[in-house]
């Protein structure tokens, strides 16, 4: 008996066009359940707990019924990706520390020196997390890179300090004199290296993107903090440790390393034409690659194509039109403009028919669907009556859709009442309505073309003197966010070069040396961009930092070479 009732309800459900391609797809026998988050829980840690609990229940249901379950939606995708970023950040951090420890051990053959260096970067990492908390920032795709970045920049600081300490100790055989020489020689070098590296990342704070601003502030502050940690921690610790033994300074006389450096030196001075020629070829090759770079980002393009999150998103795109929210607001510019006549409804219906023809979109949901559903109900559920009411029919249906007095009819404005449902798509003055529609993740390159097509349709259907149409939603904000980040990259590189050039002029007081220092920093950026173009890596929020990292490392090496040159010039005349 229960099965027959259920079958009857299912048949009745499928006679309601309102739900077709919205909650079920008859062609693929797919049924969709929509879950909404309470606003108070959407941006809290409770979201992860709720989603995990939901997944457990659905997995049990899937096992018991042998039915395939697909989960997607913007809150779900963001939650899963955020959790993965936290886990991957931990592995990335541990991996960078482990590799750094192995490198230091192989290089210096000293456990105390290795532990001291790891302590410096560990303090830097703790400071980076503390800075994020103090500034009220959360772990995002970009800020998750800051702790490993601290390791990458902090370890060279330690290596240069230790290398100078070992070199000075070998010359003087006096620990105190070696520490003094280390601080006097490497202090200014490390200071300017960290200043320029901090500038390279801090300039992101000058952009309009909130995501890049957060990253710029935290990374800039913590890269400068690394200098003070290194300067205040390494010399005192070295003064308490035993002087380096012969084993610890043996790397200074490594014949293989010396042979390699001598070869590089010979090529630099004896084969200048070859060096410049190869560099020119690389630059030309890179410029061609730069022209191939695509500016395109997708919501889940950083996930493997075989990942369940990616597969489920594509399933929803095939069966439900996607999960990316798109909101269209239609304003009649007059109070009660939506109900004065059926003309606005006819225009909206024409526009929604256009939306149904767009392959990027799912089924639209708005005031028109509610009114057509109400008309069907008025005619005792006849599916052929699911259409926009005429003027006469609207006069009969309208009283049933008007907000009732909550005192005389407490059920009238409950969340499940028709009035409450319609109120979600119409404002209190009845002058504006919204259409909600899900769309596919078509990427930031195709989205402007799609929006231009939408704009042309709205101008053709709606008279701009009587209507104002606005297209918004997460799909549009995603595009704007991606564009802000990519534009911010160009701005940040410009400001980075300008500020770094000022630092170079202050440090060397020489325009030729300034030009000499900037050229080696432009070439790595060109090669980096060229490689991205040839390999097919798109310019997107998750890859823009590659340029800052390349600039930071190139500047670091350039300054160390030039400061060393400036220090040795008076001594060697």
Task: Spell out what each predicted region is.
Residues 428-433, 438-573:
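C-terminal transmembrane helical bundles of large multi-pass transporters
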Residues 236, 250-298, 307, 311:
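Signature of alpha-helical transmembrane segments and their immediate interfacial
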Residues 134, 151-161, 187-206, 211-252, ...:
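Transmembrane alpha-helices and their membrane-interface boundaries in multi-pass membrane transporters
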Residues 168-195, 569-573:
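Helix-loop junctions and hydrophobic alpha-helical segments within the transmembrane domains
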Residues 101-105, 121-122, 138-159, 202, ...:
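Hydrophobic transmembrane alpha-helices
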Residues 2-111, 346, 405-496:
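Extracytoplasmic
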């Amino acid at each position: 008996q229960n099965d027959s009732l259920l079958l009857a309800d299912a048949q009745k459900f499928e006679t309601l066009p309102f739900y077709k391609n919205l909650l079920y797809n008859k062609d693929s026998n797919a049924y969709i359940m929509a879950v909404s988050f309470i606003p108070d829980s959407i941006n809290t840690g409770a979201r992860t707990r709720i989603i995990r609990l939901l997944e457990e229940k659905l997995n049990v249901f899937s096992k018991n019924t042998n039915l395939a379950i697909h989960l997607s939606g913007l809150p779900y995708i963001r939650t899963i990706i955020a959790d993965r970023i936290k886990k991957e950040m931990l592995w990335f951090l541990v991996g960078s520390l482990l590799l750094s420890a192995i490198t230091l051990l192989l290089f210096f053959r000293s456990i105390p020196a290795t532990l001291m260096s790891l302590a410096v970067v560990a303090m830097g990492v703790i400071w980076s997390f503390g800075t994020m908390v103090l500034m009220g920032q959360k772990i995002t795709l970009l800020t998750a890179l800051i702790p490993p970045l601290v390791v990458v920049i902090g370890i060279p600081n330690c290596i240069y300090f230790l290398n100078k300490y070992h070199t000075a100790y070998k010359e003087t055989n006096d620990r105190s004199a070696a520490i003094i020489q280390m601080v006097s020689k490497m202090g200014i070098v490390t200071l300017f290296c960290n200043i320029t590296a901090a500038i390279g990342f801090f300039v992101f704070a000058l952009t309009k993107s909130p995501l890049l601003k957060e990253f710029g502030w935290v990374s800039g502050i913590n890269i400068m903090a690394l200098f003070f940690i290194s300067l205040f921690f390494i010399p005192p610790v070295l003064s308490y440790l035993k002087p380096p033994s012969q084993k610890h300074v043996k790397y200074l006389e490594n014949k293989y390393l010396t042979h390699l450096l001598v070869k590089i030196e010979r090529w630099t001075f004896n084969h200048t034409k070859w060096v410049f020629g190869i560099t020119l070829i690389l630059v030309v090759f890179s410029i061609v690659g730069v022209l191939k770079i695509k500016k395109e980002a997708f919501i889940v393009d950083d996930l493997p194509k075989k990942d369940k999150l990616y597969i489920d998103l594509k399933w929803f795109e095939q069966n439900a039109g996607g999960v990316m929210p798109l909101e269209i607001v239609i304003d009649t510019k007059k109070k009660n403009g939506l109900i004065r006549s059926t003309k606005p409804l006819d225009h909206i219906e024409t526009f929604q028919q256009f939306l149904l023809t767009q392959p990027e979109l799912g089924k639209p949901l708005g005031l028109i669907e509610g009114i057509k559903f109400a008309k069907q109900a008025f005619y005792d559920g006849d599916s052929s009556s699911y259409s926009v009411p005429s003027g006469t029919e609207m006069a009969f249906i309208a009283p049933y859709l008007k907000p009732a007095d909550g005192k005389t009819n407490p059920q009238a404005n409950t969340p499940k009442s028709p009035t409450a449902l319609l109120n979600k798509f119409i404002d209190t003055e009845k002058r504006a309505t919204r259409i909600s529609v899900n769309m596919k993740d078509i990427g930031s390159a195709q989205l402007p073309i799609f929006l231009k097509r939408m704009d042309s349709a709205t101008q053709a259907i709606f008279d701009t003197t009587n209507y104002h149409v606005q297209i918004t939603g997460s799909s549009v904000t995603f595009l704007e966010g991606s564009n802000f980040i990519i534009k911010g990259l160009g701005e940040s590189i410009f400001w980075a070069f300008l500020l770094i050039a000022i630092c170079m002029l202050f440090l060397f007081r020489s325009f030729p040396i300034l030009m000499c220092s900037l050229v080696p920093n432009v070439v790595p950026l060109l090669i980096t961009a060229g490689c991205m173009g040839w390999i097919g890596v798109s310019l997107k929020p998750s890859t823009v930092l590659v340029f800052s990292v390349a600039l930071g490392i190139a500047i670091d090496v350039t300054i160390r070479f030039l400061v060393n040159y400036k220090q040795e010039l008076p001594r060697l005349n």
